[in-house]
């Protein structure tokens, strides 16, 4: 999906509001994914899945940092996420559907924390952005 100039503005504005809460929101989204979609836990056999575990916080921070990098490279997501795509496709072998599940959980988390800013237009822009990130992350599976 092509991101319009309005989408890019919505994404950057929304991400600025996330700011220093990125790691916290990332961890909340990861925890929400594990609770809502328990099969996703199979990729993390060494994790402590209790609320607020350090492993969930650390992975949430990684997710947030990767998305922050992607927001900074909206015109070159494949270049910005190439290493991460290789990791997930060749080493971790994560089922591509899990990216969609995490994206959904992230949208729910952001809507929960920023309800007044999470307008239909912002929701649509973030959804397109996360779909594009998912597409890039799964592009090397083929």
Curated annotation (Swiss-Prot):
InterPro entries: Globin (IPR000971), Globin-like_sf (IPR009050), Globin/Proto (IPR012292), Hemoglobin_a-typ (IPR002338), Hemoglobin_oxygen_transport (IPR050056), Hemoglobin_pi (IPR002339)
Annotated ranges, domain Globin: 2-142
A single GO cellular-component term on record: blood microparticle
PTM-bearing positions, type Phosphotyrosine: 25
Residue numbers binding heme b: 88
Gene Ontology molecular functions: haptoglobin binding; heme binding; iron ion binding; organic acid binding; oxygen binding; oxygen carrier activity; peroxidase activity
Presence of the UniProt keyword Cell membrane in the record: no
Residue positions binding O2: 59
Pfam families xrefs: Globin
N6-succinyllysine modification, residue list: 8, 12, 17, 41
Swiss-Prot/TrEMBL GO biological process terms: hydrogen peroxide catabolic process; regulation of translation
Protein family membership: Belongs to the globin family.
Protein name as catalogued: Hemoglobin subunit alpha-1/2
């Amino acid at each position: 999906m092509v991101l319009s100039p309005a989408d890019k503005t919505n994404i950057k504005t929304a991400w600025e509001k996330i700011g220093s809460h990125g790691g916290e929101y990332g961890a909340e989204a990861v925890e929400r994914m594990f609770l809502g979609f328990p099969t996703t836990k199979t990729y993390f056999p060494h994790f402590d899945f209790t609320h607020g575990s350090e492993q969930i916080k650390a992975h949430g921070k990684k997710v947030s940092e990767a998305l922050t990098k992607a927001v900074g490279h909206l015109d070159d997501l494949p270049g910005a996420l190439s290493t991460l795509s290789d990791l997930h496709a060749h080493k971790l072998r994560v089922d591509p559907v899990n990216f969609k599940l995490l994206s959904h959980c992230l949208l729910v988390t952001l809507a929960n924390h920023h309800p007044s800013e999470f307008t239909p237009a912002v929701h649509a822009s973030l959804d397109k952005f996360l779909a594009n990130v998912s597409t890039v992350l799964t592009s090397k599976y083929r």
